[in-house]
Amino acid sequence: MLSALADGAAAVRDQGVEVRRVLLIGGAALNPAVQAVAAQVLDVPVTVPAPGEYVADGAARQAAWALSGTRPEWTVSTRASSEPDLVPAIGERYRAAQALGSLPR
């Protein structure tokens, strides 16, 4: 799961878009180990928002943005967060294994 998320973030970065933070949503996001490892692998702060209807909210906000041309404000209340500097070796080992071709792409 986190490998695919890291690949997605890398693809976004390859397009010149800065990834400043990642929101983890879903059952696995509640696991503190997943939060910590995600921050290391993605090398950005990871936030777990309070429970909510984020998929529906996101779709509605995108529709409003497309129709109005104005980006809607979206405040997310935080349930938990993890910074990427907790265990730097995790991210380093992940990137080294990926560079060697040891991880699927």
Per-range role (PLM):
Residues 1-105:
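Glycine/Thr-rich phosphate-binding loops that ligate phosphate moieties of nucleotide
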